[in-house]
Regions:
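Secreted, disulfide-rich extracellular signaling modules
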Residues: 2-10, 14-278
């Protein structure tokens, strides 16, 4: 029995030594299939560019539906550079005026309502924003080669400056901001035309635009941003949010008459957008 245990022990030891053989010469003898590979190429990059997808409807075209929102102002950041936006639109009478010759003109104001969207610095130390109101020198010209649309780079036919306003871009402040026009030749003449019941204030039954004669006389308005502005503001494009108001009186009685945003046909309304990359 002693010899049997000894023989069994020697057999186990021999098998253990054989299984622990450290001969490495057999490693790597078999080929392993590999579907991956590394390829190195050298390319000379000559030009690069950035493609920007337009996120704003800048024009409804001659037959499109109304634009409900435009943008105005100037905004600068380190990624997209400097972006400026200037809206262009028309105003028309809301009714035929009935103003007696005894009434005297006090002032003329232009009111606008900032929409929901604001880009830029609106903190307590925000930079005052400056906007200037211009009269259009002529009606914008359609791009007949592009389906009668205006594009974001189409220039605005700037005319005379009518007023300037500066304000801090805080919501409560902006809700009370308006332009105050000077009592000059233009406003005095328009008020006199109202008193004389001039034909431009009468609706045209045979035209697609009721007050087409008025638009031929007063081509429209545009708003320009100051060069130091740092906010882009949305602008509500509805008649009750964009209007020119004439303030006048007779004795102790005060009155107003409004020229509001054209909503019947708005093909001449668009806004110009420019971007200077960083």
């Amino acid at each position: 029995s002693y010899y049997m245990r000894l023989i069994f022990f020697l057999l186990i030891a021999t098998l253990g030594l054989y299984s622990c053989n450290n001969d490495l010469t057999t490693i790597g003898q078999d080929l392993i299939n590999n579907g991956n590979h590394i390829e190195v190429q050298t390319t000379l990059l000559k030009e690069t560019g950035t493609i920007k997808i337009d996120s704003f409807i800048t024009s409804s075209g001659r037959y499109g539906s109304a634009i409900t929102e435009m943008f105005m102002g100037r905004y600068k950041d380190q990624y997209s550079g400097v972006t400026t936006a200037s809206p262009c639109f028309q105003i028309v009478p809301v009714s035929r005026p009935s103003i007696n010759f005894r009434y005297l003109l006090d002032s003329v104001t232009f009111h606008f309502k900032v929409g929901k969207n604001i880009w830029g610095d609106t903190t307590e130390t925000a930079t005052p924003q400056t906007l200037s109101l211009y009269r259009l020198a002529r009606l914008p010209e359609f791009r007949t080669d592009q389906n009668d649309y205006f594009y974001n780079r189409d220039s605005i036919p700037w005319g005379d400056k009518l007023a300037t306003v500066s304000f801090i871009p805080k919501r409560m402040i902006m809700n009370q901001v308006y332009f105050k026009l000077e009592k000059d030749t233009l406003t005095e003449r328009m008020f006199a035309m109202m008193q004389n019941d001039d034909p431009i204030f009468r609706p045209n039954s045979n035209s697609e635009i009721s007050y087409y004669k008025f638009i031929n006389y007063f081509k429209g308005l545009a708003i320009q941003s100051g060069k130091d502005n740092n906010c882009l503001l949305s602008l509500e494009m509805i008649p009750d949010s964009l209007y020119m108001r004439f303030h006048y009186h007779n004795a102790d009685q005060k009155y107003t008459y409004d020229l509001k945003l054209l909503s019947q046909r708005n093909e001449y309304q668009y806004f110009n957008v420019k971007n200077i990359p960083s």
